[in-house]
């Protein structure tokens, strides 16, 4: 026999459920407002007490309403927030299972792909997916098995709200942790985002890739080209994240490909330059846009990245010498169409000149005494002081430090400046020299 108190509670619950069932759009909106206000942050036992051990009866009504109305955006944000109260409650595993059993994950992912749904509702959908993903490995796998990575990545690329995009980053970060079965899928999805048009999405993808790379261990072959292309961005915050990722990636098996790619960007291809010249001849206004052309932005960013890498690791600096980085930097210094390339290349060349006496000798010989002294006195402002003839000399230089390094041995500069290397490092460099010599 139930007590009078219990009967009264059950009666209140039935009355509430009947009110919901009979309510129209406006009335349901008010019910949801009140539910959110009074139940935010409650635990599962507290929700059960509130609903006389029948909380699931209201949850099933919320999920049913969600499935029926989500395409019309009717009270969608409030519905999602209300469901979130159940799913995020402490000890709410039962509610989570009930939601998933009726296809909750697929509904949330579909919401992300619908253009007519408001951004705020999509953000709430992402938050629910976060709750599900944070509930354990099984739930992360369920999201991935529902083509979730693709849906989430596409939404990140298309979203117009930076706040929402940051919520998506949190979700992707969760999916890459503790998800060995599908972590590679998430990793590839992040790489696929790099060419997208949204600077914020690029920035967040690069940040998450830095977190994901140590978890994945191996690198995907496409990551090198994708990251190098991102260097052509006009957005400094994206460029910064790309360089930070490059700093991490040189510790993996793509190191040589990355270094070669960076050096190659210092001298734009003849094909690209010919395209630019053709555009200028047909439309002189293109001249005004040259500072923002991707190939020049890449050139400047590559010079900057090379400087960062060389200052951080002497062995990388020496590898770059074998890739003829000095020639590339001097060529960039002669690019009068892009002053930032000239400035950054000059600063990076200064670093190599200070680190390697042999480089200083070759640079001095190529520049001539007058230009070299100008360079030493203020490398950063050199581009403002050189004339067209000096710029042409720099752009057309044929400096080749590689042969001289091989003749003198890798210890020529480094032993003089920094003392002897350990045997493992010397063995690595000897192998690197032999590889270069075989290609000469």
Swiss-Prot record:
UniProt-listed InterPro entries: ARM-like, ARM-type_fold, DUF5578
Gene Ontology, cellular component aspect: cytosol; plasma membrane
Pfam families named in the record: DUF5578 (PF17741)
Domain of life: Eukaryota
PANTHER family found in the cross-reference section: ARMADILLO-LIKE HELICAL DOMAIN CONTAINING PROTEIN 1
Protein name: Armadillo-like helical domain containing protein 1
Taxonomic source organism: Homo sapiens (Human)
Name of the gene this protein is made from: ARMH1
